[in-house]
Each structure stands twice: as C-alpha cells, then as structure tokens.
C-alpha cells in the first residue's frame, strides 16, 4: 500500500497503517489504559457494526499476552449501539455524537449522557462540528458546544449522585489551547486532540494529576 501524489500520480513509499499495526503499537505503550475506536456505518447498513466488532475481537484474541488496556467502541447512532454486545470485559461502548454546525434549537436533544444511561454505558462522547462557522448561524458553534456539554456534565453528576454510576465524557477534536483549558475547567473526562504533548502540558500546568 502507499499514497499517490495528486499531481504526478507517482506512488510513494509511505505505508498505510493497518489495524494490526495499531494494535501492535498499542500493546507496547505501558501507560495506555484506553484505546478508543470509532465504528462508522450508515444506519441502513448498521448490521456492519457487530461484524466490525467481531473482526476487532478476533484480532485482539491473537495477542499474547492479552492487552492490559480496555477498548472503547464508539458508535454514532443508537441503532448501531443496540447491536453491540461483547462477553469481554475489556470492551466498553460509547454513543458518539458530533454536533451539527448550525440549526440546534433544542439543546437537550443533542446531549449524550441520557443515551449512555439508557444503554448502561460508562462512556459518552461529543464532537465539535468539523466544519463550523459563526456566519452560518446567529450563534457561535463553540458557545453552543459548551452549552450542550454543560448540560451533559450536569446530567452526569446527577446520575452519579443518584446511582453511584459514573459516565466518562470525552470531547473531540480540539487543538486550540484556550478551548482545551476551558474543557478541563468544565470537567470533561477526556479530550481527543492531534497535539497530545500540548494537552498533557496544559493539564499538568493546571494542576491535574496524570497517570
């Protein structure tokens, strides 16, 4: 495998990593606790979700010794989530919602924690719109994201107080330092970023204890 230059159409020597490559890298990371895998399939092809999960499990079963970290399988629709079952305790599931860039009227409708509560999941994730612009709407997408996230955080805390069960909320994808600081202050449990070293430095400077 390799990439082709879009202009010259010449194939490069860069190797496209496979899932096996990812797993081989992951098992070498001594401090790794979670590996988040996003499974994507159209709703009308949701039957592919459990098929992909089984392929993942088959690959993981070949690893010796077994990995010490857990897998979080993230799915963007409830229909796909309903099909996911695993007897392995190291596989966890998460409803994954990316907010639309505009058109949000009912903020509660876009929260993720209620879905996690319904499926008894330990994780939920909420994504910032990839293509967002304040000109598309009267509302700033970042302000909308924070509002929905704040609702989720309140639901998470209320759920914990009522049941002692905790739902970890993951925010994605953020590379802006100010936004990352804001997310940490709000109380998210994890942040997906393309700049992990920067994220770690920010968290340490803010007094967070990292494993």
List the predicted regions and their residue ranges.
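Metal-dependent phosphodiesterase/phospholipase catalytic core, i.e.
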Residues: 1-92, 142-144
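C-terminal active-site rim and adjoining tail of enzyme catalytic domains
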Residues: 94-211
């Amino acid at each position: 495998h390799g990439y082709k230059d879009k202009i010259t159409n010449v194939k490069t020597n860069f190797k496209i990593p496979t899932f096996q490559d990812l797993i081989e890298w992951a098992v070498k990371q001594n401090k790794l606790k979670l590996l988040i895998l996003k499974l994507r399939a159209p709703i009308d092809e949701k039957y592919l979700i459990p098929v992909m999960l089984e392929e993942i499990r088959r690959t993981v079963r070949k690893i010796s010794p077994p990995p010490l970290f857990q897998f979080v399988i993230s799915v963007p629709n409830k229909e796909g989530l309903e099909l996911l079952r695993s007897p392995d305790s190291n596989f966890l599931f998460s409803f994954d919602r990316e907010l639309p860039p505009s058109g949000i009227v009912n903020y509660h409708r876009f929260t993720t924690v209620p879905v996690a509560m319904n499926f008894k999941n330990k994780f939920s994730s909420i994504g910032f719109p990839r293509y967002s612009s304040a000109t598309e709407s009267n509302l700033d997408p970042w302000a909308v994201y924070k509002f929905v996230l704040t609702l989720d955080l309140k639901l998470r805390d209320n759920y914990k107080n009522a049941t002692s069960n905790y739902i970890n909320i993951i925010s994605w994808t953020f590379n802006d330092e100010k936004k990352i600081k804001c997310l940490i202050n709000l109380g998210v449990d994890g942040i997906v970023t393309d700049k992990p070293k920067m994220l770690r430095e920010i968290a340490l400077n803010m007094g967070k204890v990292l494993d």
